[in-house]
Amino acid sequence: MIIKSIQLSNFRNYEKLDISFDTETNIIYGDNAQGKTNILEAAYLSGTTKSHKGSKDKEMIRFGEDEAHIRTIVEKNDKEYRIDMHLRKNGAKGVAINKMPIKKASELFGILNIVFFSPEDLNIIKNGPAERRRFIDLELCQLDKIYLSNLSKYNKTLVQRNRLLKDIAYRPDLIDTLQVWDMQLLEYGRHVIKKRREFVNELNEIIQDIHSNISGGREKLILKYEPSIDDIFFEDELLKARSRDLKLCQTTVGPHRDDMLFSVDGVDIRKYGSQGQQRTSALSLKLSEISLVKKNINSTPVLLLDDVLSELDGNRQNYLLNSLSDTQTIITCTGLDEFVKNRFQVDKVFHVVKGQVEVIDE
């Protein structure tokens, strides 16, 4: 799949923008704070309805305006899709596919699959379990609408159960209603655990060869899914935890507490890995993500690289860019020196200055 073009109106620092991309390597360069990442953010929004930064809709609307518009033309398996997205200050987002409004984000997922790689992706490895759950969920939700539905229902049930736990502290007679939410939590949670385990196992099979190649065969990276509780024992553990849950007024077992372990040669690299090992593992993860998506949907996702090359040494840069021959890639950076020096193939170049984009090389 490819992004053919993006049109922006009152999005971030862009009053108007109409940009068309090459099918392979696109470079967007310019000084910091000129608007390079905003173009990638618009592309990511078009595939997921959310900002990769976690920004609210109103924060992405140009200062002084009431709404922003993004139009993205996508080509996938010889079929063209037009994705229109309206962001409004009141939070009422509107999305249409080929001029037909959609009611749920799930209707959009799968049309434009995005793999986004930025220096912040080191947080997947370095930070707490929430970052790794977020990574798993974002990818699975793009690939599997049933998973998206079960995850959404699980999260809603979790909120309701936690609210009830707080209410029981003041109204003990409500405790009999806890069983209703427990049954729903178990139903949706088991599906979430099962799919996450399958996803991590599949990703682990792919990532080992990629990481071995990047590290020159010196390291073996293993991913392991670490659920807070196995789906088989979920019901028993939820019952055992009930008194603790009532005391803390929150649900203490379930997939909302899962984690994923990154280990190199048996060592947990979140705790004990060098920054070089963590960067190599993050790169391996993103390249594995591309392969996994391609395997599952029979189409290559679009890769967005946000100022990530400056974080990689020459060997990692070479491996990354030489691995992308069949992948549309949009790269932001502050200059072109690395591309010229290493003679990387570049198909289209854009220069950004204060929200104005100029095509440098057709």
UniProtKB/Swiss-Prot annotation:
GO terms for cellular component: cytoplasm. One of its GO terms (biological process) is double-strand break repair. InterPro entries: DNA-binding_RecF, DNA-binding_RecF_CS, P-loop_NTPase, RecF/RecN/SMC_N, RecF_2. Coiled coil: none annotated. Belongs to the RecF family. This is DNA replication and repair protein RecF. GO terms for molecular function: ATP binding; single-stranded DNA binding. It is found in: Cytoplasm. It comes from the Bacteria. Gene3D superfamilies: P-loop containing nucleotide triphosphate hydrolases (3.40.50.300), RecF/RecN/SMC, N-terminal domain (1.20.1050.90). Its main location: cytoplasm. Keywords: ATP-binding, Cytoplasm, DNA damage, DNA repair, DNA replication, DNA-binding, Nucleotide-binding, SOS response. ATP binds at G30, D31, N32, A33, Q34, G35, K36, T37. The keyword Transmembrane helix does not apply. The RecF protein is involved in DNA metabolism; it is required for DNA replication and normal SOS inducibility. RecF binds preferentially to single-stranded, linear DNA. It also seems to bind ATP.
